[in-house]
C-alpha cells in the first residue's frame, strides 16, 4: 500500500534542482507543499542517512543522492551497451548524442555523450523535458499504442514551448 511519508521524502529530494541546489527549510516546505515541521523532519532524516547536508540555514543534496538514480542505470545493461555506439555516432556527426526513456509525458535522459563545442546545451543524465517539445520525445510517443498515447495526453495540457512549436 501507499506510504505517504516515503512519497513526501522523495518530493523533498526532487525539490532540489539546478535552479535550487541549496534551499532553506522554508523554501523546501514551499516547493513541496509540506509544513515547515514536516519538511524539517524529512530533511533531518535525509541528513542522518547522508543524502542531504545542512549548515544550519541551507540544505543541499550530497553525492550520495546519486545512488538513487545510479541504481536504475546500473540495473539496465542496455545503457552500457548503447554508450559506445553513441560515442561513435557523436564523433561522426560532431554533435552530442542522448538516449532517453519516457516517464509519463516527459523524457528523461539516461545516457549522454557530449562533444566539445563552444556552444552546447546543458543536458545531462537525469535531465527531464516534456516529450512533446523534443524530437526524441515525439519519437518515443509515436511508438505508443493509440490508446496509451491518448491516456497519457489526457493527463496534462500541451503547451507550446516557443511560437514555432508544432501542436498537432
Where in the sequence are the language-model features?
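N-terminal helix-turn-helix
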Residues: 1-80
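Short, intrinsically disordered, charge-balanced linker/junction segments flanking boundaries
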Residues: 149-150, 158-168
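Conserved short-loop catalytic and cofactor-binding motifs
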Residues: 16, 70, 137, 160-164
Amino acid at each position: 500500500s501507499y506510504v505517504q511519508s516515503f512519497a513526501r521524502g522523495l518530493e523533498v529530494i526532487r525539490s532540489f534542482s539546478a535552479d535550487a541546489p541549496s534551499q532553506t527549510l522554508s523554501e523546501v516546505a514551499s516547493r513541496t507543499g509540506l509544513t515547515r515541521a514536516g519538511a524539517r523532519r524529512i530533511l533531518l532524516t535525509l541528513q542522518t542517512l547522508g543524502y542531504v547536508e545542512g549548515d544550519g540555514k541551507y540544505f543541499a543534496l550530497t553525492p550520495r543522492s546519486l545512488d538513487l538514480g545510479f541504481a536504475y542505470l546500473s540495473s539496465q545493461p542496455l545503457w552500457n551497451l548503447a554508450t559506445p555506439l553513441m560515442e561513435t555516432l557523436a564523433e561522426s556527426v560532431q554533435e552530442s548524442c542522448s538516449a532517453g526513456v519516457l516517464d509519463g509525458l516527459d523524457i528523461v535522459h539516461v545516457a549522454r555523450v557530449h562533444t566539445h563545442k563552444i556552444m552546447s546545451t546543458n543536458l545531462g543524465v537525469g535531465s527531464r523535458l516534456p516529450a512533446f517539445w523534443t524530437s526524441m520525445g515525439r519519437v518515443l510517443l509515436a511508438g505508443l499504442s493509440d490508446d496509451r498515447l491518448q491516456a497519457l495526453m489526457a493527463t496534462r495540457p500541451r503547451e507550446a514551448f516557443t511560437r514555432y512549436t508544432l501542436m498537432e
